Amino acid sequence: MSLVHINILMAFIMSLTGLLMYRSHLMSALLCLEGMMLSLFVLATLTILNSHFTLANMMPIILLVFAACEAAIGLALLVMISNTYGTDYVQNLNLLQC
């Protein structure tokens, strides 16, 4: 395993740790999720380039599409919570149930 792969895995682990530690605010949780998705994208791209597996060239692009959709939904939820309650605490998500 090369040093680049180890650094990317460490970035993923740091983002996961940040998600587990700072989960009280929705904005920090969304930032940690974006860090995880970015490290997964770079790791998938490097793995496909190193293995020369041409059939999976679209996988990083599909991962980016899902990351963009996740970010859009997360930001819409953040705006809705902050407009309704004035804060971005994750505990307010339980109050949005119908």
UniProtKB/Swiss-Prot annotation:
Matches recorded under Gene3D superfamilies: 1.10.287.3510
Annotated TM spans: 1-21, 29-49, 61-81
Membrane topology: Multi-pass membrane protein
EC id: 7.1.1.2
One annotated GO biological process: ATP synthesis coupled electron transport
Gene Ontology molecular function, alphabetical: NADH dehydrogenase (ubiquinone) activity
UniProt key word Zinc-finger: no
Subcellular location per the Swiss-Prot or TrEMBL entry: Mitochondrion inner membrane
Keyword Electron transport tagged: yes
InterPro entries noted in UniProt: NADH_UbQ_OxRdtase_chain4L/K, NUOK/Mnh_C1-like
Reactions performed catalytically: a ubiquinone + NADH + 5 H(+)(in) = a ubiquinol + NAD(+) + 4 H(+)(out)
GO CC list: mitochondrial inner membrane; respiratory chain complex I
One Pfam family in the UniProt entry: Oxidored_q2
Residue stretches in coiled coil: none
Entry keyword set: Electron transport, Membrane, Mitochondrion, Mitochondrion inner membrane, NAD, Respiratory chain, Translocase, Transmembrane, Transmembrane helix, Transport, Ubiquinone
Domain of life where this protein originates: Eukaryota
Protein family according to the UniProt entry: Belongs to the complex I subunit 4L family.
Annotated PANTHER family: NADH-UBIQUINONE OXIDOREDUCTASE CHAIN 4L (PTHR11434:SF0), NADH-UBIQUINONE OXIDOREDUCTASE SUBUNIT ND4L (PTHR11434)
Role this protein plays: Core subunit of the mitochondrial membrane respiratory chain NADH dehydrogenase (Complex I) which catalyzes electron transfer from NADH through the respiratory chain, using ubiquinone as an electron acceptor. Part of the enzyme membrane arm which is embedded in the lipid bilayer and involved in proton translocation.
Subunit: Core subunit of respiratory chain NADH dehydrogenase (Complex I) which is composed of 45 different subunits.
The name this protein goes by in its record: NADH-ubiquinone oxidoreductase chain 4L
